[in-house]
């Protein structure tokens, strides 16, 4: 009987000059079958889309400096530059309002309100949050992740595809899926972060035999 297996796909360094679907076919195509789910790290998708900047290119406002004082050092907004990037994308007053509402919500034991409102903050990888040479950059969330997932399915013939945001702190979120894929189920399968966005260079993971094991 087939069993689920997570296969990490090694690549070279992928940049904004690469097409992520081409890279998946080149490095993992030989191992992708019609019952498999192809998972790709959101930071690599965003880098390919040119959605990154360097900290020195940002003009940090007082709102970003203020809010950053209250952000946990392990969070995606650990630096003032990451916070400023989120403000540039969402608007500084929206992010400030989200912070105030989030602080009030925490009093009533309801966490996560800030990141639910300020979506750019939850999707931004701060400096050192991704693989070299982009570890000196701030990487924004990917654009149209559902469309990216659909392109992967169309090109590879796999059962499904997802764009995933996973870290070593047991945070697993699916930002985009192809049609018919249960994002919560895939997020749980990736909870231990099989991706290697640093020196491992394995930003692609194949969930083998997913369709048959899940009874699809």
Question: Residues of each region from the PLM?
Answer:
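N-terminal and secondary-structure boundary signal
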Residues: 1-216
């Amino acid at each position: 009987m087939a069993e689920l297996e997570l296969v990490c796909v090694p690549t070279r360094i992928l940049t904004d000059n690469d097409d992520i679907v081409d890279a998946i076919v080149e490095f993992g195509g030989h191992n992708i079958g019609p019952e498999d789910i192809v998972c790709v790290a959101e930071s690599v998708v965003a880098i390919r889309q040119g959605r990154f900047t360097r900290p020195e290119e940002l003009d940090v406002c007082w709102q970003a400096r203020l809010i950053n004082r209250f952000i946990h050092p392990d969070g995606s907004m650990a630096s003032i530059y990451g916070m400023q990037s989120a403000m540039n994308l969402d608007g500084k007053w929206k992010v400030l309002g989200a912070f105030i509402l989030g602080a009030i919500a925490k009093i009533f034991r309801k966490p996560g309100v800030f990141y639910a409102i300020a979506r750019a903050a939850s999707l931004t990888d701060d400096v050192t949050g991704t693989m070299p040479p982009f570890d000196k950059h701030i990487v924004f969330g990917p654009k149209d992740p559902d469309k990216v997932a659909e392109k992967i399915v169309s090109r590879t013939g796999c059962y499904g595809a997802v764009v995933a945001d996973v870290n070593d702190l047991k945070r697993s979120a699916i930002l985009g899926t192809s049609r018919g894929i249960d994002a919560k189920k895939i997020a749980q399968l990736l909870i231990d972060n099989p991706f290697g966005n640093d020196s491992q260079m394995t930003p692609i993971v194949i969930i083998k035999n997913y369709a048959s094991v899940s009874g699809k």
